[in-house]
Amino acid sequence: MPGLLLGDEAPNFEADTTQGGIRFHDFLGDSWGILFSHPRDFTPVCTTELGRAAKLAPEFSKRNVKMIALSIDSVPDHLAWSKDINAYNGDQPVEKLPFPIIADKDRELAVKLGMLDPDERDKDGMPLTARVVFIFGPDKKLKLSILYPATTGRNFDEILRVVDSLQLTAYKKVATPVDWKCGDSVMVVPTLPDEEAKKLFPKGVFTKDLPSGKKYLRYTPQPE
């Protein structure tokens, strides 16, 4: 099945959305971007997901991240459903979210991007879109891909955490360890020699002693 692999450039597709027609590369501009699909409008898990995405939209915006959703529903359905999403969030039930939703009624994009879930089908037996998350860098290349089944809602706080890690590690020679969150210490990448690490990280590099005697667990406070 067609799809995207890490490092692939995003296709410069055209699409109809709740905010008008777009060309994807123009939409992204020089920003980071998150493209996320959901199975259907007017369904319970999807409503909670897009509600949380809407609540976190200001945080993504602070990080220069543009968000755009996608499903096989029509633009009128997306707009009507937006009222329910806003009401779920306790906001005014208006036909507007802080990000556009793509109407991929013929499944053309879902097929091209590998977003279909073979186990979830509509009343006509056609596959629905899965819960996919693609994160693109300013170079339009895929930096992260996550695929969830229809039964499991996504954690958008985790997606925000991943963005923090991707942006930090894109510009600094560090990696983020398990359960890392912004402000925690990070790991110095193994390919960086000790002397260069000391120059790059003036706050200090701390190496954990290990039974193997190898010096690969090197920590440093998160660089600015």
UniProtKB/Swiss-Prot annotation:
The keyword Methyltransferase appears for this protein: no
Modified residues (Phosphothreonine): T176
Pfam family, one: 1-cysPrx_C
Localisation: Cytoplasm; Lysosome
Chain intervals for the UniProt region annotation (Required and sufficient for targeting to lysosomes and lamellar bodies): 30-39
Keywords: Antioxidant, Cytoplasm, Hydrolase, Lipid degradation, Lipid metabolism, Lysosome, Multifunctional enzyme, Oxidoreductase, Peroxidase, Phosphoprotein, Redox-active center, Transferase
Phosphotyrosine PTM positions: Y88
A GO cellular component entry from the record: lysosome
Enzyme Commission number(s) from the entry: 1.11.1.27, 3.1.1.4, 2.3.1.23
Domain (Thioredoxin) ranges: 4-168
Annotated PROSITE patterns: THIOREDOXIN_2 (PS51352)
Domain of life: Eukaryota
Task performed by this protein: Thiol-specific peroxidase that catalyzes the reduction of hydrogen peroxide and organic hydroperoxides to water and alcohols, respectively. Can reduce H(2)O(2) and short chain organic, fatty acid, and phospholipid hydroperoxides. Also has phospholipase activity, and can therefore either reduce the oxidized sn-2 fatty acyl group of phospholipids (peroxidase activity) or hydrolyze the sn-2 ester bond of phospholipids (phospholipase activity). These activities are dependent on binding to phospholipids at acidic pH and to oxidized phospholipds at cytosolic pH.
Subunit structure: Homodimer. Interacts with GSTP1; mediates PRDX6 glutathionylation and regeneration.
Miscellaneous information on this protein: The active site is a conserved redox-active cysteine residue, the peroxidatic cysteine (C(P)), which makes the nucleophilic attack on the peroxide substrate. The peroxide oxidizes the C(P)-SH to cysteine sulfenic acid (C(P)-SOH), which then reacts with another cysteine residue, the resolving cysteine (C(R)), to form a disulfide bridge. The disulfide is subsequently reduced by an appropriate electron donor to complete the catalytic cycle. In this 1-Cys peroxiredoxin, no C(R) is present and C(P) instead forms a disulfide with a cysteine from another protein or with a small thiol molecule.
Family: Belongs to the peroxiredoxin family. Prx6 subfamily.
Protein name (record): Peroxiredoxin-6
Annotated organism of origin: Gallus gallus (Chicken)
Gene designation: PRDX6
